[in-house]
């Protein structure tokens, strides 16, 4: 089971974050056909917004989420961005969360810090434990 799916652009910031995070993850391709997932996952994505917030969600992420199966298995989103862009910082997370009715679990800047990595690891562990507990309760 892959519990993380991520997209990283040519800048590689999100890829560097994911490498340091050290958890199994599926990387979305930039141009190839989108994969289809078969288990619940958290999406990690950068933000690409213009000054008005348009285009915040990268096109490969949109393509991936346009697959209804992929969208149905999405459980949360972690978004990256650059604080220099003010209100559009990590905006992709807010857009995806609203459209897919999932929580934004965390926001990080550029390739993240060691504090971000520690918080993400701990937060994801708590999140998946809560998801497991919820699944067990609904199956009883």
Swiss-Prot record:
Domain of life per record: Bacteria
Family annotation (Gene3D superfamilies): 3.40.50.360
GO terms assigned for molecular function: FMN binding
Pfam families, alphabetized: Flavodoxin_NdrI
NCBIfam families: nrdI (TIGR00333)
Family to which this protein belongs: Belongs to the NrdI family.
Protein function: Probably involved in ribonucleotide reductase function.
PANTHER family referenced in this protein's UniProt entry, alphabetically: PROTEIN NRDI
Protein name, per record: Protein NrdI
Source organism (scientific name): Ruegeria sp. (strain TM1040) (Silicibacter sp.)
């Amino acid at each position: 089971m892959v519990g993380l799916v991520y997209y990283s652009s040519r800048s590689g910031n999100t890829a560097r974050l994911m490498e340091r995070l050290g958890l199994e993850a599926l990387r979305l391709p930039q141009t190839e056909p989108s994969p289809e997932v078969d288990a619940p996952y958290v999406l990690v994505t950068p933000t690409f917004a213009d000054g008005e917030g348009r285009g915040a969600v990268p096109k490969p992420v949109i393509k991936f989420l346009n697959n209804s199966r992929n969208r149905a298995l999405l459980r949360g989103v972690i978004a990256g961005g650059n604080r220099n862009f003010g209100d559009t910082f990590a905006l992709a997370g807010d857009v995806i969360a609203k459209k897919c009715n999932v929580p934004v679990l965390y926001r990080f800047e550029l390739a993240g810090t060691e504090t971000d990595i520690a918080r993400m690891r701990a937060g994801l562990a708590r999140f998946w434990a809560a998801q497991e507990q919820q699944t067990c309760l609904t199956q009883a």
